[in-house]
Amino acid sequence: TVLLNQTGTKLAALGQVVIDPDTGEISAGLITEYQERDQDTQAFVDSINQEFSTVLSQVVASTDVALTTVDPSTGERIIRSQETNLGDLCADAYREVLDADVGLINGGGIRADIAAGEITYGDIISVHPYNNQATSVRVTGQQLLDALELGARYTPYENGGFLHAS
């Protein structure tokens, strides 16, 4: 027997696995409501937030339009099934940073919108919260086409591997 326990994202829940030592029975569940916060942990989190607040609030760019993961007319998330202005910008940025002919980013790695106006470093971290590394590789035209086709294989349905290209 293999027990699978997934808690979701953004720490919305904690996973709890209980093994009864007498019976060997295994149970799993999610904890989504908390009675009280641990004061030492909260103080630690607050100190980290304070330490990074200056860096995260630093303005690094601006935009005249909202940069989105959604369809502006319906509000439906589309970043994983079709192009968006934010996906295009991210792919453009990777192409520029890597001095490459083509820039690609998967829609599943783009996690937040950016409102029109000033863009902070914190906004960029919200869009790209993972510690992914930008990488440059040499590929053939066929390999590039194969990657694009693989990314679009579930269109029009959502797929975190949907590629935004520049």
What are these regions (language model features)?
Residues 2-3, 13-16, 24-27, 84, ...:
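Feature captures C-terminal
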Residues 36-119, 157:
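Hard-cation-handling environments
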Residues 1-59, 155-165:
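Active-site-adjacent helix-turn-beta-strand microarchitecture at beta-sheet edges
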Residues 29-31, 61-66, 136:
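Short amphipathic
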Residues 2, 31, 35, 46, ...:
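A near-ubiquitous, low-amplitude feature marking generic local secondary-structure context
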